[in-house]
């Protein structure tokens, strides 16, 4: 009856069966591991992708780098829009109301495609001006413009990829999105090789490679979620489509705080770069490489966070508040334990991690120091990552977004600016570690107070 033990345990949530601590941990691990592997493979493929583009030369790399933060921001807005609906789907699935879960999915497709088409029109309209607004010169702006135009045209497929992935995760299927995440990365590398090296299309080829990867993977992903999944299969419903305004209103309540957070956090990253820039080229390179190396260490946190969102969403929808709290505490505890271990690994092997990225001794020494400072904050970084995912699963996004923004702008950037004057890049990373520790503590306070449970109710839809 069940494909695997994870399916049986997910069914236990909806059927009201009691679950032992061992079963809960097995379920968390079963949902987390595929997502962790997908996160890590995505980072690795990103490195390979960046290396391929880097071989085009400095101008090509700069032209893509110029608008890279903008493309990430747009992608995060589409992801936030998808989350507003996927949280509701998880709640309805937990409540065993599969019909309404599919209704929400239909609304998500309509609203999300409309939103992505609007962003496409905006992107097409500004693609010629954006590189100059970002400070690009005449030598790279034309290439940046073409790259951004091609990316803008594929935004509906970017949304379809995100919404399909999130809907499957909401239904408890972590394996398919994880496989698709690996496939889209591999496709990106293959198409980039084809367009960049075989067809000699340069920067335009890099954009076409990304576009083709999204096109080729988003459609199968959509078919699996909307036509093949036993819970979400939209062909099961025979009644005509009916517009339900409350689904959209609740999606906005969840998505808008996340979107605002993404915009302001992107701005904070830009300010952080501006603080590091005057410290010199060695500091800039060490900062960049340390961030890259650290990203491999916190991927497990995001994988466990994906599991937390699904489990909290379904148990919250099922009205099993005690089980909801139990999963929240267990996922946060597991995340902190795993990332504490990763922190130890990062502290011990920091020289080797930076050495892989740069052979320059001065960069290696400074980057190693940065990683060792950050290692002490990893458990609290995990607390913030997983607790935020818990809150999102419960539909609680306003106050968590305020915590993220408040600590970033009021603590990290303020401290980084002050400490950089006396301690250089070391001061910037001390500020980062201090802020992550404080952020983690604030999220833990919110977790144990339980106010995240009161923010959203399925029966209010």
Predicted regions and their residues:
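Short alpha-helical transmembrane segments in multi-pass integral membrane proteins
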Residues: 1-35, 89-154, 198-256, 312-377, ...
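N-terminal transmembrane alpha-helices
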Residues: 23-51, 55-56, 72-84, 88, ...
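Transmembrane helical elements of multi-pass membrane transporters/channels
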Residues: 30-49, 150, 161, 184, ...
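Transmembrane alpha-helix boundary and packing residues in multipass membrane permease domains
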Residues: 35, 39, 50-51, 68, ...
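Helix-terminus/linker motif at the lipid-water interface of multi-pass membrane proteins
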Residues: 44-62, 131-138, 194-201, 259, ...
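Small-residue-rich hydrophobic transmembrane alpha-helices
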Residues: 61-121, 158-177, 273, 286-350, ...
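Short runs within selected transmembrane alpha-helices of multi-pass transporters and secretion channels
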Residues: 82, 86, 150-169, 177-188, ...
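Membrane-water interface regions at transmembrane-helix termini and the short interhelical loops
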Residues: 164-172, 192-204
């Amino acid at each position: 009856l069940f494909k695997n033990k994870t399916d049986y345990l997910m069914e236990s949530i909806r059927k009201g069966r009691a679950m032992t601590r061992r079963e809960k941990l097995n379920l968390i691990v079963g949902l987390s591991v595929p997502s962790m592997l997908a996160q890590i493979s995505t980072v690795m493929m990103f490195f390979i992708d960046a290396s391929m583009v880097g071989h085009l030369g400095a101008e090509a790399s700069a032209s893509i780098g110029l608008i890279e933060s903008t493309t990430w921001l747009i992608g995060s807005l589409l992801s936030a829009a998808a989350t507003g609906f996927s949280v509701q789907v998880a709640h309805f699935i937990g409540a065993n109301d599969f019909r309404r879960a599919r209704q929400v999915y239909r609304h998500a497709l309509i609203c999300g495609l409309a939103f992505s088409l609007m962003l496409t029109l905006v992107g097409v309209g500004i693609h010629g001006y954006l590189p100059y607004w970002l400070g690009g010169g005449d030598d790279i702006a034309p290439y940046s413009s073409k790259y951004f135009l091609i990316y803008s045209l594929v935004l509906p497929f970017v949304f379809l990829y995100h919404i399909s992935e999130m809907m499957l995760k909401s239904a408890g299927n972590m394996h398919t999105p994880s496989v698709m995440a690996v496939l889209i990365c591999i496709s990106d590398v293959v198409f980039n090789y084809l367009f960049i090296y075989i067809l000699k299309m340069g920067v335009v080829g890099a954009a076409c490679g990304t576009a083709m990867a999204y096109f080729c993977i988003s459609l199968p992903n959509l078919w699996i979620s909307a036509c093949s999944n036993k819970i979400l299969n939209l062909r099961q419903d025979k009644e005509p489509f009916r517009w339900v305004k409350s689904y959209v209103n609740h999606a906005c309540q969840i998505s808008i705080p996340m979107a605002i957070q993404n915009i302001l956090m992107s701005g904070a990253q830009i300010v952080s770069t501006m603080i590091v820039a005057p410290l010199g080229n060695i500091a800039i390179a060490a900062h960049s490489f340390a961030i890259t190396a650290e990203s491999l260490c916190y991927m497990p946190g995001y994988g466990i966070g994906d599991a937390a969102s699904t489990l909290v969403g379904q148990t919250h929808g099922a009205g099993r508040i005690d089980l909801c709290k139990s999963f929240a505490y267990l996922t946060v505890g597991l995340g902190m334990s795993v990332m504490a271990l990763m922190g130890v690994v990062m502290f011990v092997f920091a020289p080797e991690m930076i050495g892989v990225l740069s052979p320059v001794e001065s960069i290696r020494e400074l980057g190693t120091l940065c990683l060792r400072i950050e290692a002490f904050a990893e458990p609290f970084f995990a607390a913030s990552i997983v607790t935020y995912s818990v809150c999102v699963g419960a539909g609680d996004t306003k106050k968590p977004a305020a915590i993220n923004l408040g600590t970033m702008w009021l603590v990290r950037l303020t401290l980084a600016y002050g400490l950089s004057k006396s301690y250089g890049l070391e001061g910037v990373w001390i500020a980062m570690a201090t802020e992550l520790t404080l952020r983690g503590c604030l999220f833990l306070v919110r977790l144990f107070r339980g106010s995240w449970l009161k923010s959203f109710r399925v029966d209010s839809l």
